[in-house]
Structure formats: C-alpha cells, structure tokens
Amino acid sequence: MIFGIKAQKEVDSLGLHYELTPTDFTSKVADCYDLYFTGVHESKIYAQLLLPKKSSAKHPVIFQFHGYHSDVGDWLDKLAFVSEGYVVVALSVRGQGGESEDCLQTSGGTLKGHLIRGIEDGPEKLFYRAVFQDVYQLTNVVSRLPFVDSSKMASYGVSQGGALALVCAALCPKVKRTFVQYPFLSDYRTAYGLEVTQSAYEELAYYFRYRDPLHEREEAVFAALDYVDIQYLVDRIQAEVIWAMGLEDRVCHPKTQFAVYNHIQAPKKLYFYPEYGHEYLPKFNDKIHQILGGK
C-alpha cells in the first residue's frame, strides 16, 4: 500500500483557501509574504513566500523543505534564489519547529518523533501521510498564484526536506527539477536493521521497546510505514533529479537512500561525497545554481 489517489482527493475536496499577507521582513530585492493555507484535519499550514521585488512578470518557483524537527529558517536564506528571478516558497512542516498547526487526532505513542505518530491507527492516520498531503496542497495553491510560471517549478530539500522535495516532484508533474541531499523517510525495514538508535529512525527502536517489546505487531507496523515510504512514490517523478550523498552518513544511511534512488525512472544524477556524512556538503549549492541557469 502506498500514498495514493484517495489521499490526493481528500486534499482536492478542501478547495484552495489561502491567505497571502506581507511580512515585516524587508529586502531590496524581494517582496516577502506569509502564506497560510488550509490543510487536512483542519490544520492551518504556513509557508514563507518571497518574489522578486515590484515585478509584474510571472516567475519560476523553487519549493524548499526543511529538516526533521526544524523550521523554515530565516528569510535571508532565500534571497540568493530571489535575486536570480525565482519565487521561493518554504513550507513549515506541521507540528515541528515552525508555525504550521497539526490537528491530526491519533492514539498510541509518539515517543521520540513523528515517524510513529498514528502507527497504531493504520496508514490513513500516519503523521507523514498528512505532511505529504500538505506538500500536494502547497503545489496546488502556489501554481495558481498570478505571479507564478507553473511551467517552471523546482523543489529542494535536505534530509526530511529531501524526502519532501521528492514527494513534491512525485505529486506535482509540473515540477521539472528536484535537488535533494541524503533524504529521510525510506526503506524503514533496512533502517531498523542498521545502527537505528544513532539514526533519524531511532524512534522505531523506542516504539518497539516501549509499545511492542515482543514485536507482535512488527509486520503491521512496517506494512503501515510502507504507505509513507518514498521509495514507492518516486517512480511517479517526471522531473530531473539531482542528488547528493555522503557515504559516511549514518543518520540516513546510504543503503536507505539507494532504495529510493534506484526506483527513480526519470533522468537523475548522483554526486558522491566519500568523506562526508549527514552534514553540509560543499559545492552542491553552487551546482544547483548553475543547473537552474545561473551559469
């Protein structure tokens, strides 16, 4: 079972209710806005939106997604892309470090993280199902804004954000390029069998330790997580995929990343960093800039 048409139809039934209001942050190159829209479970979802200053033209878009537990970051971080003519939209993942609400009702434990949120209620109550739906709704809203050229869209993210950048490309065929670094949310069985307590997947170990110490529900747990395993979504991607991987990564192990990369049928390029782990990967942002047309 994978994230499918039913989940997208639930989002489509919400309509496109959003608010776009100027923010207090000012810039000589960008007009900056707070974007709020209605997500599933009546949650109010937030994103930063920046566009080239006082421009009446339509612009290409780059969607940005942040790492696990974090937030959208500073406005300043996005100005480089805006100065090159892009609209930048940075999603605040529900229930994490930013302003987005998470009104999903679940039972069971959530110790140590969101990956197991809703796991005892079945795949349709999983936290990340709602997050994937938010990503889909974000693309619906942004692609219809009057200053957006929806034929020129890209996505970018690191770790959790890398996973969501791939989800964005999978659920929105208008996305033409996606740039990712060491994405999270993949190949949960393999991740659990590795150094799980030192990884982004450590909450799986805590779940079994405290909620299912005899592993009587193990098969049901992993079957539910298949629903939000990005390796089963990425075959939908039509965009070009540019990927960076640190071969010493033990937070999102290369084995779990290859499970995803190998399922991508679209054009793709993988950059290896043999001496690097789950950390800043130099030169990759410069490559993104060059690929997006800043040569």
Please name every model-derived segment.
Residues 167-214, 272:
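Hydrolase active-site cap/lid region
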